């Protein structure tokens, strides 16, 4: 275990095109094998497609999508006397954004459209309208937390 304590959080730079930290986080979630320029091309292309389809600011569409995907509760495993309980806990705001972006990107990859730009754009649009696999994942997470409410007193 490290003796110095947790590593300090590094500040995120605003994205150069939209001036948004959310877009920077999305680029970092799409990033694979250090190919940042490719990740930026995918994200900017997806946001352009979203703007063309909705006619509104793509960052506003992305924020609306994230609000529909961000979980408020999740379950965490807690071992008590030989049994493992799924204990519902509230999700910290920064973690909820991270989870929402992770779900958006992972469910984009699973879609059937031809290019990743189309997949990401359509997943963002679906999520902003309350549809799509990422929103379903949030609902499933909330259902799990609700089903395990009896173990809420094991919170830590």
Curated annotation (Swiss-Prot):
> What is this protein's name?
Small ribosomal subunit protein uS7
Please give the organism. Mycobacterium sp. (strain KMS)
User: Sorted alphabetically, which NCBIfam families does this protein's record hold?
Assistant: rpsG_bact (TIGR01029)
The record's keywords, sorted A to Z, are: Ribonucleoprotein, Ribosomal protein, RNA-binding, rRNA-binding, tRNA-binding
Self-association and partners:
Part of the 30S ribosomal subunit. Contacts proteins S9 and S11.
Could you tell me what this protein does?
A: One of the primary rRNA binding proteins, it binds directly to 16S rRNA where it nucleates assembly of the head domain of the 30S subunit. Is located at the subunit interface close to the decoding center, probably blocks exit of the E-site tRNA.
InterPro entries per the record? Ribosomal_uS7, Ribosomal_uS7_bac/org-type, Ribosomal_uS7_CS, Ribosomal_uS7_dom, Ribosomal_uS7_dom_sf
What the entry lists under PANTHER family is as follows: RIBOSOMAL PROTEIN S7 (PTHR11205)
The record's listing under CDD domains reads: uS7_Bacteria (cd14869)
The yes or no answer to whether the keyword Ion transport is present is no
Q: Which family does it belong to?
A: Belongs to the universal ribosomal protein uS7 family.
List the Gene Ontology MF annotations in alphabetical order. rRNA binding; structural constituent of ribosome; tRNA binding
Domain of life assignment: Bacteria
Q: Which GO terms describe its biological process?
A: translation
Q: Name one GO cellular component term.
A: small ribosomal subunit
């Amino acid at each position: 275990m490290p003796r110095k304590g947790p590593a300090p959080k590094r500040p995120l730079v605003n994205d150069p095109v939209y001036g948004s930290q959310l877009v920077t986080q999305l680029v970092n979630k799409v990033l694979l094998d250090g190919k940042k320029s490719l990740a930026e091309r995918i994200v900017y292309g997806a946001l352009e497609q979203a703007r063309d389809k909705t006619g509104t600011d793509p960052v506003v569409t992305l924020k609306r999508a994230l609000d529909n995907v961000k979980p408020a509760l999740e379950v965490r495993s807690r071992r008590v006397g030989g049994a493992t309980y799924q204990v519902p806990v509230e999700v910290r705001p920064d973690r909820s954004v991270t989870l929402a972006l992770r779900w958006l990107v992972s469910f984009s990859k699973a879609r059937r459209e031809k290019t990743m730009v189309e997949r990401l754009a359509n997943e963002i649009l679906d999520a902003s309208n309350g549809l799509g696999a990422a929103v379903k994942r949030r609902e499933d997470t909330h259902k799990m937390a609700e089903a395990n409410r009896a173990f809420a007193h094991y919170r830590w």
